[in-house]
Every structure is written in C-alpha cells, then in structure tokens.
Amino acid sequence: MQQIVLASGNKGKLAEFDQMLAAYGVKVLPQSQFNVSEVAETGTTFVENAIIKARHAAQITGHAAIADDSGLEVDLLQGVPGIYSARYAGENAKDQDNVLKLLDTLKDYPAPRTARFQCVLVYMRHAKDPTPIICQASWEGQIDFVQRGDNGHGYDPIFIPEHHDCSAAQMSSDEKNTLSHRGKALVQLITAMQEKGVFTDRNAQ
C-alpha cells in the first residue's frame, strides 16, 4: 500500500484524508509517526504555508507529503481569522478557545454573518519537488450565534453552510466530505494526482 505523510497533527484532518484516499490504496500517515515537529508557518498566504509544511514533512520523513492550510474568513472582520484561524485565541489555543473568541467578537453583529472556509492542499513528491500539485477550494456559509453538533473540529459547530439549516458539525462525515472546502480540494487533488500518475494501477480501486 502506498504511503503518504500528512503534514499535520490534527486528528480530524487525518481522518478526513485517510477516509477519502483509502479507496485509492493509499494510507495516510500522520507526521507525528515520524517524530516530525511542527514547522513555523511564516507565510502570508494559505499557499505559502501549505508549501512550507509539505516540504518540511517530506524532507524529514523521506516520503511524499500532503499539507493542508485552511482557515475561516469572516466578511465582517475583513477576512479574519484567515491564516491565523488555528491560533486565533493564542499560540496554543484549542478549538474551543478559538470558537468562543469568534463568537464573542461577533456578538454585536446581526445575521447574516457571512463567512467561508478556505483550503489549500499541496502534494510534494519529495522535499525539492519543483512542481508541487496545488489545489484550492472554498465553502460558503455564515457564522451562527451558538454551537451545534459534535461531528467536526475547528469552527464546524458555528459554521452554517450555504443552503443548509444545520452546522457543519451536525453533518454526516460523507455529506461533509462532499460539500466541504477540504473535501472539494481533496477531490481536485486526487484528480491531479491521477493525471500525474501518482496512483499506480494496483492502487486504484
């Protein structure tokens, strides 16, 4: 089975990637399995940070790597928290800390509080890959006033997807994989990886 390292320690992301790539005979391994430390995200865009993370993981593990850089953009806040979504409430903030800070920041704003999740995925064959595969997708919606659901991570409990009445954390994993920014970007990435021959015939199901 082909192995690709995910340049993240986020268990929620690992589950999403592993579930969607399993059909292609690919096992997604967390970088923690190789004792890869988190790298400083010094970029000013999602693309830059994803490349930094993928290169770091590939260099240390010797495996091909996928990195995800994603975040939530709130229109009322001019795109904040953006690339700082994971550390919106501080460098060591947990998901709940970030959610509570955003709810507090928006408490005086009425609906609709439009927002979107952005996701950039980068696949690097090796650390010096000069032509990494880069895919981007978004998921439109708005920020709710309360948290709902527990089938998700990050800001999922307060994100109401466009044309839906439930939060992202109230959706089934299959539904979320179809609609979400990460799910859509991963479909793009899988297609691009197939076109470039990353998956061998015996991998594809």
Curated annotation (Swiss-Prot):
Protein purpose: Pyrophosphatase that catalyzes the hydrolysis of nucleoside triphosphates to their monophosphate derivatives, with a high preference for the non-canonical purine nucleotides XTP (xanthosine triphosphate), dITP (deoxyinosine triphosphate) and ITP. Seems to function as a house-cleaning enzyme that removes non-canonical purine nucleotides from the nucleotide pool, thus preventing their incorporation into DNA/RNA and avoiding chromosomal lesions.
Catalytic reaction annotation: XTP + H2O = XMP + diphosphate + H(+); dITP + H2O = dIMP + diphosphate + H(+); ITP + H2O = IMP + diphosphate + H(+)
One GO CC term on file: cytoplasm
EC number(s) given by UniProt: 3.6.1.66
Keywords on record: Hydrolase, Magnesium, Metal-binding, Nucleotide metabolism, Nucleotide-binding
Residues at the active site: D69 (proton acceptor)
Record-listed substrate binding positions: S8, G9, N10, K11, G12, K13, S70, H153, G154, Y155, D156, K176, H181, R182
Keyword Transferase among record annotations: no
Entries under InterPro entries matching the protein: dITP/XTP_pyrophosphatase, ITPase-like_fam, RdgB/HAM1
Organism whose genome encodes this protein: Shewanella oneidensis (strain ATCC 700550 / JCM 31522 / CIP 106686 / LMG 19005 / NCIMB 14063 / MR-1)
CDD domains reported in the protein's UniProt record: HAM1 (cd00515)
Hydrolase in keyword set: yes
Name of the molecule in the record: dITP/XTP pyrophosphatase
UniProt GO BP: nucleoside triphosphate catabolic process; nucleotide metabolic process; purine nucleoside triphosphate catabolic process
PANTHER family hit by this protein: INOSINE TRIPHOSPHATE PYROPHOSPHATASE (PTHR11067:SF9), INOSINE TRIPHOSPHATE PYROPHOSPHATASE/HAM1 PROTEIN (PTHR11067)
